[in-house]
């Protein structure tokens, strides 16, 4: 009877030991997963900082291109009477300015593919991250349209301007072209420039909106990270 009772007690002891060990293992695993999630979110926040710098540059570049086209459209009737270096600069900005947005989606994909995204408590963070990277593909398509428009216009620029020096502006674009044309900008070229301006403006507005959303996303990520008791 005593032996039977001892066996039962030992079995119960082993069960308790196993249960506690299993609980601690699961808890440690859960803590580890939470740590990985937070590391990914921190990296995404750092990527956001880099993206914000790139997008602010892009917004300035596309604003400059749009303003150059507006100037050419407004002054085309009097183009031959204006300073050749000014006209050449505006044509160069109108035709050549384009951007290529390069983002880093590695952390987002890792968070998504590992299932760690399910550990994010704030649903707003999940939705904001997903919407951000979806929108990037759209921006790249707009940029491709602008590059293609510029490629179509380059023959006119090369035929009617000459690069006198290789000085760059504050954004890194050439500002040394001088107008050598003998006529105002032909209407087909002017109309294509107007189309290009519309795309620049559309892109610039989308980027400004993305800048606001990325700043808000950084704040949301900060709130999510503050929920981790290990960080408080």
Predicted regions and their residues:
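Long, hydrophobic alpha-helical segments that serve as membrane-spanning/inserting helices
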Residues: 23, 27-232
């Amino acid at each position: 009877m005593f032996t039977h009772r001892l066996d039962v007690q030992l079995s119960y002891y082993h069960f308790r030991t196993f249960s506690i060990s299993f609980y601690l293992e699961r808890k440690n695993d859960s803590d580890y997963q939470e740590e990985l999630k937070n590391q990914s979110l921190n990296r995404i926040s750092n990527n956001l900082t880099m993206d914000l710098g790139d997008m602010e540059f892009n917004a300035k570049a596309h604003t400059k291109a749009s303003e150059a086209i507006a100037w050419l459209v407004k002054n085309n009737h009097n183009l031959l009477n204006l300073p050749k270096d000014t006209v050449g600069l505006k044509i160069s900005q109108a035709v050549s300015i384009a951007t290529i947005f390069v983002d880093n989606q590695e952390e987002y994909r890792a968070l998504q593919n590992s299932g760690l995204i399910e550990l994010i408590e704030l649903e707003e963070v999940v939705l904001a991250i997903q919407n951000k990277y979806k929108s990037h593909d759209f921006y790249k398509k707009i940029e491709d349209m602008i590059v293609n428009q510029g490629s179509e216009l380059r023959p006119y620029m090369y035929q009617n301007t000459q690069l006198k020096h290789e000085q760059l502006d504050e954004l890194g674009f050439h500002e040394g072209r001088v107008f050598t044309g003998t006529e105002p900008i032909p209407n087909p070229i002017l109309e294509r420039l107007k189309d290009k301006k519309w795309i620049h403006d559309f892109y610039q507005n989308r980027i400004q909106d993305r800048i606001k959303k990325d700043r808000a996303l950084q704040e949301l990520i900060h709130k999510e990270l503050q929920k981790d008791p290990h960080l408080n």
